[in-house]
């Protein structure tokens, strides 16, 4: 059984079809990358996959549970780090993780223990009492990841988890995600950085205009090229015309 099965998803905003019949199969136990240029439909797809946004058509199943007809069972299995994360930022980092853990039904003692372990692992222990509204963008990203992990989900869906994160924290996040997959979990993550996806993911899909243009194992998609070269080939690289922005060179 796949960890995530997305079938014929459609989402339209006015006369723009952001997601256009997109289907995706994420194998259980995989580290799966979702890549595409800005406006390709990645965030909209992930929002529908997690139940944050209702599709106009199509279905989403998490380990056999339909996200829309069986939302309680499906969402209990998912940990989510959405794009443009909005949290209760008048709580401290420690309070926020505990709060999310209690919402997820964890015992208070377990919630406290896991909060401390996550704060330590993500390098936030020294700032645990600081209000989240005073966190940097990278710290906010890390506290969001802690909240996604606290209930030990079976599927993590992460939108740009490495954005605004420093190299040391990024390396720790990679270690956490690798350990999560090694223990039987599944990760679906989006990123604009091909090098991150190439180093971390075993499978991926390239999305453009709300459609999957290529999908499979990393080697299948790359076809012997680097992922960056293959990505540019699939989506169509743009080249700056010689006369463009000529005024920049006039001084």
PLM feature spans:
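Conserved ABC ATPase "signature" region
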Residues: 98, 102, 109-127
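Conserved catalytic motifs of ABC-family nucleotide-binding domains
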Residues: 152
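Catalytic Walker B motif of ABC-type/P-loop ATPase nucleotide-binding domains
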Residues: 156-160
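Helical segment within the ABC ATPase nucleotide-binding domain
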Residues: 170-183
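A short, surface-exposed alpha-helical micro-motif characterized by mixed small hydrophobic
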Residues: 197-199
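ABC ATPase "signature
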Residues: 215-216
